[in-house]
Design a protein with these regions (language model features):
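Cross-family detector of peptidyl-prolyl cis-trans isomerase
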Residues: 1-281
Length: 281
């Protein structure tokens, strides 16, 4: 009987040691192992591959938005529509001219035109309605994003309504949708804290520089309108389209979820209101 008791307690002790070891190993992994950040693979027609590491620790909503759109195929076939040498290259607009915005259908990959969604403020939205995300940078009161916009940094593009009124700063800050830009130099660090940096090129920076050096023309204000040599329009539209053939993101098994959505600012509605008029689309 004594021998049986000794065997029982020996087995119990061994089991306790094993359990404690497993729990200890799990805790050790939790506190010491870093989850891999998402890695973007971007294929650009006639130019090559660019790989980007995303930083959810700096701009979680921007990362959620980019990962979702990319893996839904939103960026496949879009252009780098704006290229400014010694500054940046900008893309991600489905219209290809800088005026487009993603919709809930793009975010949820839905073909159901009757589907309904909600903005963060709980207002109803249709599948075809556009959305924006909150600007995650210091000027907008978001203190966690300390990423500097140096060479290779990827950031969310946004509108600047303050050119129409200084009172529209918040509307400008929260106007990002799908468009992004990649910095090609360290000479514009004044942008740090004013745009949401959310990633960095880790491979293929030479591809970015090759795109930076493409021949550009002035952007036309209307389809078919010729630009003038004396025009004040920015010379930033590539003469030959620079097409992103595919974008995919490896999240290493992490589900980042969908971003919080904001109803886009309606500039025309605001403008009409300045003159006491009602605007109808």
């Amino acid at each position: 009987m004594k021998d049986f008791s000794k065997i029982f307690w020996s087995i119990a002790l061994i089991l306790v040691i094993i359990i404690l070891g497993v729990l200890g190993l799990g805790y050790y992994k939790k506190v010491t192992l870093k989850t891999s950040n998402p890695i973007v693979t971007m294929e650009i027609q006639n130019y090559g591959t660019v790989k980007i590491e995303l930083y959810p620790e700096y701009a979680p909503e921007a990362v959620k938005n980019f990962v979702t759109l990319a893996n839904n195929g939103y960026y496949n076939g879009v252009k780098f529509h704006r290229v400014v040498k010694d500054f940046m290259i900008q893309g991600g607009d489905s219209k290809g001219d800088g005026t487009g915005s993603p919709t809930f259908a793009d975010l949820y990959k839905s073909d159901d035109e009757n589907a309904t969604y909600k903005y963060t403020n709980n207002k109803d939205a249709k599948s075809t309605d556009p959305y924006n995300i909150k600007g995650e940078f210091i000027a907008n009161g978001y203190k966690n994003n300390t990423l500097n916009l140096t060479e290779g940094t990827v950031a969310m593009a946004r509108a600047d309504y303050t050119q129409y009124s200084p009172a529209l700063a918040e509307e400008s800050y929260n106007s990002a949708g799908s468009q992004f830009f990649i910095m090609t130099t360290n000479n514009h660090t004044n942008l740090s804290g004013n745009y949401a940096g959310f990633g960095k090129v880790i491979e293929g920076m030479e591809v970015v520089h090759n795109i930076e050096n493409v021949e550009c023309k002035s952007a036309s204000t209307e389809e078919g309108t010729e630009s003038s040599e004396n025009s004040n329009a920015e010379v930033s539209t590539p003469v030959t389209d620079v097409i992103i053939t595919s974008v995919s993101v490896d999240t290493f098994g992490v589900n980042y979820g969908k971003p919080k959505t904001i109803e886009p600012f309606n500039y025309m509605q605001w403008l009409y209101a300045q003159y006491g008029l009602n605007y109808t689309e």
